[in-house]
């Protein structure tokens, strides 16, 4: 596998994996870079360049074996490993993440949720216990956790991230509407839901304009 891969390539990998999974489910066994590019609205050369970053998986005159390429990309994405997950915040976003079925199929197991609301603490969401926020440190001392999902208001997100850092958590999926300051050893992926909506709004406002 290549040592350095650009952020742009990394961001495209989940799309490849998703489309290949759909093709496999539809019974498609092989696909060319041109066909995959048309499906993903990318050029065939871009497809080949991205995939070649990790080795040659295609064959001249044949293209790609759909199942094999899906498995290779899944391995590159780390999807062969099991990851234990906690969700901080049992509101709308936290609950939606807990209920999303694909995560468990891809090896992401939510083992606990945390919240401050008395009416939520002590209940279960999708079979996952909701614990009080002040039990976070004790829980992390007793349970190995790979990923923490922050589904909290911006005003408490940084403080909570700092608590996670002190507990040894090094991977955070942040849905709080703010970018967080974090140490270099911690991987934080920010998901700003409004960004996608604003991009959609821009494209609607400029529909039909020719790019120069």
Predicted regions and their residues:
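HTH-adjacent hinge/linker in prokaryotic transcriptional regulators
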Residues: 30, 34, 39-82
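Phosphate-bearing ligand-interacting subdomains
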Residues: 21-24, 126-212
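Glycine-rich Rossmann-fold phosphate-binding loop(s) that bind the pyrophosphate
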Residues: 90
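Hydrophobic/small residue at the entry helix of a nucleotide-binding pocket
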Residues: 93
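Extreme N-terminal segment that seeds HTH/winged-HTH DNA-binding domains in transcriptional regulators
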Residues: 1-29
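NAD(P)-binding Rossmann-fold cofactor-contacting core
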Residues: 105-126
């Amino acid at each position: 596998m290549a040592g350095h891969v650009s952020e742009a390539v990394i961001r495209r990998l989940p799309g490849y994996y998703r489309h290949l999974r759909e093709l496999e489910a539809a019974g498609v066994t092989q696909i060319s870079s041109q066909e995959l590019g048309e499906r993903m609205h990318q050029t065939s050369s871009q497809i080949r360049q991205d995939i070649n970053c990790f080795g040659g998986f295609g064959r001249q005159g044949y293209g790609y074996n759909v199942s094999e390429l899906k498995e290779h990309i899944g391995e590159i994405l780390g999807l062969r490993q099991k990851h234990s997950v906690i969700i901080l915040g049992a509101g709308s976003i936290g609950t939606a993440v807990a209920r999303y079925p694909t995560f468990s199929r891809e090896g992401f197991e939510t083992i606990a949720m945390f919240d401050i609301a008395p009416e939520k603490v002590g209940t279960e969401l999708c079979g996952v216990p909701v614990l009080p926020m002040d039990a976070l440190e004790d829980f992390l001392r007793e349970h190995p956790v790979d990923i923490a999902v922050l589904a909290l208001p911006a005003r408490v997100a940084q403080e909570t991230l700092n608590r996670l850092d002190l507990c040894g958590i090094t991977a955070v999926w942040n849905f709080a509407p703010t970018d967080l300051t974090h140490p270099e050893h911690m991987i934080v992926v920010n998901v700003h839901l409004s960004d996608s909506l604003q991009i959609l709004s821009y494209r609607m406002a400029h529909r039909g304009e020719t790019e120069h």
